A protein has these predicted regions:
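Solvent-exposed, non-transmembrane loop/terminal regulatory segments of multi-pass membrane proteins
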Residues: 1-24, 141-150
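Extracytoplasmic/secreted envelope proteins and their assembly/folding machinery
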Residues: 7, 11, 32-36, 180, ...
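Short beta-strand segments enriched in hydrophobic/aromatic residues
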Residues: 24-26, 167
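Short amphipathic beta-strand/extended segments in non-transmembrane regions
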Residues: 33-66
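Charged, amphipathic alpha-helical linkers/stalks
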Residues: 60-108
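Short, conserved charged micro-motifs
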Residues: 29-37, 171-178
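Active-site lining segments that contact anionic ligands and/or coordinate catalytic metals
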Residues: 17-19, 36, 45, 157-162
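Extracytoplasmic
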Residues: 111-187
């Protein structure tokens, strides 16, 4: 059969992958990170990809919670501007104690801060002159926002996060099905 021969030729040239999607409730980034690490440890898993291991820059991943100083260093934004963003984020979520206490110890996941920042930009606060960003900073933020949106589009919906596993197993067979049972127990 021509189709089988073509598939075999493709597999011989490019290799074959057995990709599996794991869907979990969204929002608990720390649990997702632990699960990805646990899944990656299995010898049957070549790679595991989820929001909690998508690198943004300088070793940080999308779900890392950063202080204003860390966010400032990541984005090359002025520290005072980052403090303002963190205060606005806290106020938006009615976490006023964060504003009154030391905002410098408040940590927000990168993905959440960027979504808030772009909502903030979209609402026109930057354009109204409350906060001014230079062109380079604005360009860097646009690039990071694109990365984040691409990852989120592929790996998260409103209620669920998707993790993609590339397995070092055939698509079917006893070993594969036994490993799927193991995955069900772990997840």
């Amino acid at each position: 059969n021509e189709t089988e021969i073509a598939r075999e030729n493709i597999d011989n040239v490019f290799g074959s992958q057995n990709t599996l999607a794991v869907v979990v409730p969204a929002g608990d980034y720390e649990t997702e990170e632990r699960l990805l690490k646990r899944l990656s440890a299995f010898p049957q898993v070549d790679t595991a990809l989820g929001l909690a291991n998508v690198e943004v820059k300088d070793g940080y991943v999308l779900t890392d919670a950063l202080t204003p100083r860390q966010f400032s260093e990541l984005t090359d934004m002025d520290m005072e501007i980052c403090r303002l963003f963190y205060k606005a984020y806290a106020a938006d979520r009615e976490e006023y104690v964060r504003i009154i206490n030391n905002i410098d110890v408040f940590k927000v996941p990168i993905i959440d801060m960027f979504q808030f920042l772009y909502q903030y930009v979209g609402d026109g606060y930057l354009d109204q002159g409350y906060i001014t960003l230079d062109d380079d900073t604005r360009s860097d933020l646009d690039d990071l926002n694109k990365q984040i949106n691409d990852a989120k589009e592929q790996l998260q919906s409103e209620k669920y996060s998707r993790m993609l596993l590339n397995l070092a197993l055939p698509e079917e067979g006893q070993e594969t099905f036994a490993f799927l049972d193991t995955l069900h127990e772990v997840i």
